[in-house]
UniProtKB/Swiss-Prot annotation:
Binding site for substrate: G40, G41, R62, N153
Family: Belongs to the acetylglutamate kinase family. ArgB subfamily.
Residues with site note (Transition state stabilizer): K8, K212
UniProt pathway: Amino-acid biosynthesis; L-arginine biosynthesis; N(2)-acetyl-L-ornithine from L-glutamate: step 2/4
Known EC number: 2.7.2.8
Lineage: Bacteria, Bacillati, Bacillota, Bacilli, Bacillales
Residue runs in coiled coils: none
Function: Catalyzes the ATP-dependent phosphorylation of N-acetyl-L-glutamate.
Organism this protein belongs to: Bacillus cereus (strain AH820)
Gene: argB
Name this protein carries in UniProt: Acetylglutamate kinase
UniProt keyword Amino-acid biosynthesis, yes or no: yes
């Protein structure tokens, strides 16, 4: 059991997770060393609204001045992370919640001054993750990082991809509420970068699936070898540890 698997669960999925999801994590843990990265967008937006803080978005990124970053940190590292950890432990999965600033885990470069405290992963200090896993814990990571002793928000997809690349993980699993990419009603089990572009052009990939496949493509560029898009509300793992969904790699042809 030397291979790592990184599981990314978006904030919108956290409330939808059922017993099946946690059973799948148990199956993965029998085969691999598991790291989980989570988002928290809906809970962050709700808390910002409660605080009467208006939020602007540019190119899909939340403009994050200091007052917004304080709320992001409070939600991601506090309530969202701890509720997820408690849910895992309720299902007999030992977990430890961390943020990217713990142990200098996620170091970032600011994206731009215009959008404030938003960073892209520049370095991953994997020692903390490996130490926790060696003690049989699942690290559960809130996607914030550090730069010059300041805390920055990180897109959860790119945080997960950065961690997966740094660990040379066998696979990055993106948890969604759909079975994967569908073509004429049938699941596309394998695809690659060039084919995804074609499927978007043909209108096969539309709506909410587009950002999911874009996250997969970005992960490939960061060095991740294999990304699976799976339905977290269903059984998404075989007993062998293989995923049931759409797998995105380089140079694989389907359809």
């Amino acid at each position: 059991m030397n291979d790592y698997i990184v599981v990314k669960c978006g904030g919108s999925m956290l409330e939808q997770l059922n017993d099946v999801f946690f059973d799948c994590i148990k199956k993965l843990q029998q085969q691999y060393k598991v790291v989980i990265v989570h988002g928290g967008g809906p809970e962050i937006d709700a808390k910002l609204k409660d605080c009467n803080i208006n939020v602007e978005k540019r190119d899909g990124l939340r403009v994050t001045p200091k007052e917004v970053m304080d709320v992001v940190q409070m939600v991601l590292c506090g309530s969202t992370n701890k509720k997820f950890v408690m849910n895992l432990q309720k299902h007999n999965l030992l977990a430890v919640g961390c943020s990217g600033c713990d142990g200098k885990l996620l170091q970032v470069q600011p994206v731009s001054e215009e959008i404030g405290y938003v960073g892209e992963v520049s370095y991953v200090e994997t020692a903390l993750l490996k130490g926790l896993i060696n003690m049989n814990y699942i690290p559960v990571i809130a996607p914030i990082g550090i730069h010059d002793n300041e805390i920055y928000n990180i897109n959860a997809d790119t945080a997960a991809a950065g961690i997966a690349a740094a660990l040379s993980a066998k696979e990055l699993i993106l948890i969604t509420d759909v079975d994967g990419i569908l073509h004429e009603g049938k699941l596309v089990k394998k695809t690659d970068e060039s084919e995804i572009a074609t499927l978007i052009e043909k209108g096969v990939i539309t709506g909410g699936m587009i950002p999911k496949v874009q996250a997969a493509l970005a992960s490939l560029k960061m060095g991740v070898q294999k990304i699976s898009i799976v339905n977290g509300t269903k059984d998404f793992t075989e007993d062998t540890g293989e995923c049931i969904g759409t797998t995105v790699t380089r140079g694989v042809s389907i359809v």
